[in-house]
């Protein structure tokens, strides 16, 4: 099949752009010894850096479920304060390498993936620090809507040490 030149050029640009959307930010290491089964279930978003796809959302949760093929189904849900209604997005995640390294790519729209890297996780799998593909994306997650403040402070300090602008964190209402 022969595609017109403009279609090929746009496709190549889109592929090049998306290649930068997956991976681990420089100087950051994903968790090793990761046990995906223990990570499954519901997580509450405690804090995040601002980005358009969650802007104005409160009561945000992420629910993960392991599929038989080793991929992970993702359901993100939150209350849209501007519209006065609940919104949700479902997607899928795949490991970038071996499943004991917490570096994944997640897609909510067709073949377009973004980085999802667990960079801190307590031994009980109760609190997690998630890095996106660059330092513009960061989340603090917890198994409960109101985790201990000491744990949140620890994760914020870790994010700051990794080069994130933690003064820009948005703390999510539940």
Question: Which residues make up each language-model segment?
Answer:
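A beta-rich soluble binding module of mature secreted/lumenal proteins
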Residues: 2-3, 21-174
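Bacterial N-terminal signal peptides that target proteins for export
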Residues: 1-10
């Amino acid at each position: 099949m022969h595609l017109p030149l403009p279609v090929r050029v746009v496709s190549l640009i889109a592929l090049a752009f998306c290649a930068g959307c997956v991976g681990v930010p420089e100087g950051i290491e994903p968790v090793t010894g990761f046990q995906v089964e223990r990570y499954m279930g519901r997580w509450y978003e405690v804090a995040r850096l601002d980005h358009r796809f969650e802007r104005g959302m409160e009561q945000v949760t992420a629910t993960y479920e392991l599929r038989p093929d080793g991929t992970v189904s993702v359901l993100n849900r939150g209350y849209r304060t501007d519209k006065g209604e609940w919104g949700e997005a479902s997607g899928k995640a795949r490991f970038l390498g071996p499943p004991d390294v917490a570096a994944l790519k997640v897609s909510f729209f067709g073949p377009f993936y973004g980085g999802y890297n667990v960079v801190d996780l307590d031994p009980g799998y109760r609190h997690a620090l998630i890095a996106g593909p660059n330092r513009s994306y960061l989340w603090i997650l917890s198994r409960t809507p109101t985790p201990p403040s000491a744990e949140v402070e620890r994760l914020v300090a870790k994010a700051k040490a990794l080069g994130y602008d933690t003064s820009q964190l948005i703390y999510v209402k539940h």
